[in-house]
Amino acid sequence: MVSQFPIVIEEISEDLLQVKLKENKIDYPYFFWQLSQHILKSQNNLEVVPGEDSLVIQFNPVLQDREEIKEEIYKLTESIDAPVKNKLERSITVPVCYDNEFALDMKNILNHTGLSRREVIGEHCHRKYEVKMIGFTPGFAYLGELSEKIKLPRLTNPRPFVPKGSIGIANNRTGIYPIQGPAGWSIIGRTPINLFDTKRNDPFLILPRMELIFEQITKSEFNAMLRD
């Protein structure tokens, strides 16, 4: 089988390779997501970081041959489905509570944007987002495009910890932290649903090629969903 995807593999350091596409008519994030999954399943002890327009691969230059890895990557692209650009496969609605207890940076967001609380919430949840990529932590979904009216830069001083389900905004993206951990984005709310669970057949609830809609809920609804 001959690969239908013209890729370029660049050496960016002695232990890092970067895979790029020459073709711009396909869904870049989904292509690199598929390739990363094929690489992980091949059990070749490679670390992969899929991005929106490239894939970075880390290997051990002492134990692994760079040229053999390149050849393996070319072969793996042969089994990737043709990811047509802008073709979304499924839609998911994610409930969000924007109460102060969960919206840790709402005050700063209001000051930065000059909008009212209701307007900020409306700008965030009254639109459809595309899953651009998965990364940073297991299941973290980068969603776009965020409304221009509530675009903020990343935090100058990232938080060392936010609870799982926290929803952040930064630049033209919004994202959900599926597990507790550090966060460099402004936290606008939190969802009670479990986005990453290793006990599920598919541990990730949100995947590339999905469309996502946020739905505002009250604190009592949040707590009820958390108990279910």
Question: What are the residue ranges of the model-derived segments?
Answer:
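Glycine-rich active-site loops that engage anionic ligands at enzyme catalytic sites
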Residues: 2-228
